[in-house]
Design a protein with these regions (language model features):
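Active-site histidine-acidic residue metal-binding/catalytic motifs
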Residues: 24
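Single-stranded RNA-binding regions, centering on S1/OB-family and related RNA-binding modules
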Residues: 7
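Metal-dependent phosphoesterase core characteristic of DEDDh/y 3'-5' exonuclease domains
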Residues: 3, 11, 16-21, 40-47, ...
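Metal-dependent phosphoesterase signature
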Residues: 80-100, 108
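Short acidic, Gly/Ser-rich segments with clustered Asp/Glu that frequently serve as metal-coordination loops
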Residues: 27-37
């Protein structure tokens, strides 16, 4: 794929960075309708991640539920994500899952980037790390807001992942608002993220 005003593909850009791999992460977090739950009190309840090639091919997958400590999962959140309180009652706490993610993030030592659809995931990881007093599980990787890059490449306002897939003619596979399924779908959009924007 060739982009206007650019002669290299996303894959070629990654190779210039001496890596053909990118870690794609999608989080689900506690939430409630309207202003029912302040942003600073939201907690990760699921982490989905995939290692993907610059072409969007998934190589490895990671998925874990996380037990929240501040608030139980609301009816609204359960309806949105399909994750029930019973699903997370026996799940590990964030520090344990963060350590698992840190290990998964080291599978491709040449990688330099991790991406998510928007900046929420990056901010929420930082928020939960601070809350639990643990280091970032992704210290060696720079965050890329793929939602912003997709929008800039098309000169449009930022759109949701489902809309982006529709715009490029790809199906939304799996369950929307589940970490691993969303991470897989975001990975499919990597070829439409122009390297000059990253």
């Amino acid at each position: 794929m060739i982009y206007k005003n650019n002669t290299i593909t996303f894959k070629e850009f990654c190779m210039k960075k001496h890596s053909t791999h990118i870690l794609v992460i999608d989080l689900e977090a506690t939430c409630d309708e309207g202003d029912g739950l302040p942003g600073e009190e939201m907690e990760v309840i699921e982490i989905g991640a995939v290692w993907a090639t610059a072409d969007g091919d998934v190589l490895e997958e990671f998925q874990a539920l996380v037990r929240p400590t501040l608030h139980p999962i609301s009816d609204f959140c359960q309806e949105l994500t399909g994750i029930r309180q019973a699903d997370v009652d026996t799940a590990p706490l964030f520090p344990e899952v963060a350590a698992q993610l840190a290990s998964f993030a080291q599978h491709y030592p040449d990688a330099t980037m991790w991406g998510s659809w928007g900046k929420f995931d990056d901010k929420q990881i930082q928020r939960d790390c601070q809350r639990h007093g643990v280091a970032s599980p992704l210290p060696a990787l720079s965050h890329v807001n793929l939602k912003r890059q997709f929008a800039k490449s098309r000169k449009i306002k930022e759109v949701g992942m489902a809309r982006a897939l529709q715009m490029v003619g790809l199906p939304l596979d799996g369950a929307h608002h589940r970490g691993l399924d969303d991470a897989r779908n975001i990975a499919k959009l990597l070829p439409w993220c122009p390297p000059t924007m990253i």
